[in-house]
Amino acid sequence: KRQACGGSASSAASSAAVSEVASSAAASEEEETAAPLSATEPLRIAGLKGPTTMGLVNLLSMEQAGTAAMDYDLQLYGAADEIVPLLIKGELDMAAIPANLAATLYQKTSGGIQAVAVNTLGVLYVVEQGDTVHSTADLKGRTILSTGKGTTPEYVLRYLLTANGLDPDKDVDIQYYSEATEVTAQMASTQDAIAVLPQPYVTAAGLKDDTLRVALDLTAEWDKVADTQLITGVTVVRKAYAEEHPDVVAAFLADYAQSVNAANTDLDGTAALCEEQGVVAKAAIAKKALPNCNIVCLTGEELKADVSGYLQVLYDADPAAVGGTLPGEDFYWAAQ
């Protein structure tokens, strides 16, 4: 299993951007003169409530401690479709969004969006009240409550159902809700409910209702039928911003690697920040969920290999999942 970059057990294939920035930062510290960044305004970055933003929150404590390379304006949204227009209009510089949505946006903006990092691997689980689901095939004939129509949960679920011989449109009844909190509320009032939920909502639902059982880990199910990583989220940048401020993007990735490392090692501090920022309702939920959230910071060649492999699987299943065609080489940001 790969470690988040920036930690003591960093992957050997960690981004050149991060290592270059780290070494140049160390050199500039020795001289006590760090070159000013090309952008003076805070970096405007949006995230969704839940795992894709849990790796970002430590940027705020780093900023307060004076150890961040820049100031951050972290904005939180409930659904990805709230972020898209802001990114397109240039009212955001970066965003942490579902991987397939990043590919779709790349098509919509004629290459105006670039991926800079994978931020989250698999976080989806099937939960149920009872003990009836032990394989994907057991979902036949059932109603499944889920979030994420048009993003990762829908496409992962459809892919897994199809790979296990089920027709997603005929053999199951998938009901979509805009936010995970709606799914958990619906589960509480529905008998024999089955839901696809991401962490940390799996943990939150389990703490509220001890009859809930994690029936399937969809990452494990994915690994049985696909030879690529299951990727939940990527962090993207507007290409125009990246071209104007490549130094800021590289400095962000160095900060981000530290933030992700803290999310995986300082559970108490990260959990408190998650509650404070509204990323997760309660620190206790965040702390319990963090080890299961697969928060990473994969950049450079790892980013390209993992995301392109994942998008290929989605494309082969349904080209619409990635915006009709696979993104070109320029979709993957690399340090110049």
Name each region found by the language model.
Residues 43-45, 88, 92, 142-147, ...:
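Second-shell loop/turn segments in exported
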Residues 242-317:
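Secondary-structure end/capping motifs
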Residues 58-60, 124-135, 230-248, 299:
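A bilobed periplasmic-binding-protein/Venus flytrap-type ligand-binding module shared by bacterial periplasmic
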Residues 18-21, 32-169, 175-176, 193, ...:
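Short, glycine-/small- and polar/acidic-enriched structural segments
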Residues 308-336:
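Conserved C-terminal helix/tail region of periplasmic/extracytoplasmic solute-binding proteins
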Residues 63-71, 220-228, 295-304:
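Short, solvent-exposed loop/beta-turn-alpha elements that line the ligand-binding surface or hinge
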Residues 100-101, 109, 182-273:
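Pocket-lining segment of extracytoplasmic ligand-binding domains
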Residues 2-14:
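Bacterial lipoprotein signal-peptidase II cleavage site
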